[in-house]
């Protein structure tokens, strides 16, 4: 393929712009961490909206967008949610807000992957805003009493059986 001088300029300008963005994104990836202890400060409504919008525009197989997000802010509910599995969920009790990630298993056979992508996108958006987050796995986990973590969360929020509960962010 032969490139004319104008095309070379356009391509090189695009590449320079893209490299700058990718360096910023790479830095975001390097700096992102899972946080299990949180500050007492309130979250800005605009930040929460941005995080949820990011998840809502995340890619999904065949654009099924079968995921849904349950935002939890009530302290008592967060405390109860922190008991959804035997180990690793207690940090939920100390956060200001949690997002339960669920997906309609009848819409896509790859609902786990779709919901996982949305979850990671939420984490990256939170990190970009300077906010900490942590993925709390729910699917295929159990409470201290041996109850399925999915069933525990499903019962807490009245989630229909057709929805799989993947995680809490």
Features from the language model and the residues they span:
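Acidic, surface-exposed loops and disordered segments
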Residues: 16-169
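N-terminal amphipathic/basic-hydrophobic helices that include classical n-h-c signal peptides
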Residues: 1-21
């Amino acid at each position: 393929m032969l490139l004319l001088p104008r095309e070379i300029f356009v391509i090189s300008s695009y590449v320079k712009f893209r490299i700058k963005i990718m360096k910023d994104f790479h830095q975001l990836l390097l700096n992102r961490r899972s946080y299990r202890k949180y500050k007492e400060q309130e979250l800005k409504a605009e930040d929460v909206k941005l995080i949820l919008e990011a998840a809502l525009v995340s890619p999904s197989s065949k654009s099924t967008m079968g995921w849904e997000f349950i935002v939890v802010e009530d302290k008592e509910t967060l405390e109860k949610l922190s008991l959804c599995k035997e180990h690793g969920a207690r940090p939920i009790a100390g956060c200001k807000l949690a997002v339960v990630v669920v997906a309609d298993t009848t819409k896509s056979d790859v609902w786990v992957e779709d919901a996982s992508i949305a979850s990671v996108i939420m984490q990256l958006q939170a990190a970009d805003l300077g906010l900490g987050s942590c993925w709390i796995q729910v699917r295929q986990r159990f409470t201290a009493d041996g109850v399925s973590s999915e069933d525990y969360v499903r019962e807490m929020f009245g989630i229909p059986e057709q929805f799989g509960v993947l995680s809490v962010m």
